[in-house]
Curated annotation (Swiss-Prot):
Record-linked InterPro entries: Ribosomal_uS14, Ribosomal_uS14_bac/plastid
Example GO biological process: translation
Alphabetical list of NCBIfam families matching this protein: PRK08881.1 (NF006477)
The entry's keywords: Ribonucleoprotein, Ribosomal protein, RNA-binding, rRNA-binding
Function according to Swiss-Prot or TrEMBL: Binds 16S rRNA, required for the assembly of 30S particles and may also be responsible for determining the conformation of the 16S rRNA at the A site.
Phylogenetic placement of the source organism: Bacteria, Pseudomonadati, Pseudomonadota, Betaproteobacteria, Burkholderiales
Species per Swiss-Prot/TrEMBL record: Herminiimonas arsenicoxydans
Name of this chain's protein: Small ribosomal subunit protein uS14
GO cellular component: cytoplasm; small ribosomal subunit
Gene3D superfamilies hit by this protein: 1.10.287.1480
Recorded superkingdom: Bacteria
The keyword Signal is assigned to this record: no
Gene that specifies this protein: rpsN
Amino acid sequence: MAKLALINREQKRADLVKKYAGKRAELKAIIDDHSKSEEERYEARLKLQALPRNSAPTRQRNRCALTGRPRGTFRKFGLGRIKLRECAMRGEIPGMTKASW
């Protein structure tokens, strides 16, 4: 089980990403628009840099929803590999069966 502080930190990051997503998209559109003047693009870049660091989606880390484990997490299920296997063996994930060939 990951420390509760790490899980809370990730939740805080997810909230910040949602909060600033629109603002970041607007500023990035201005920066990428070559029809704008250099000054406008530069100001947009400064405003983007002034936003909180944790509002960038690349700062997020996928964690297991049950344990908070940061590595070996399956995006589709939101679970770590260990908990995914346990849930699959108990039949809690519809349509998932153990592979055999």
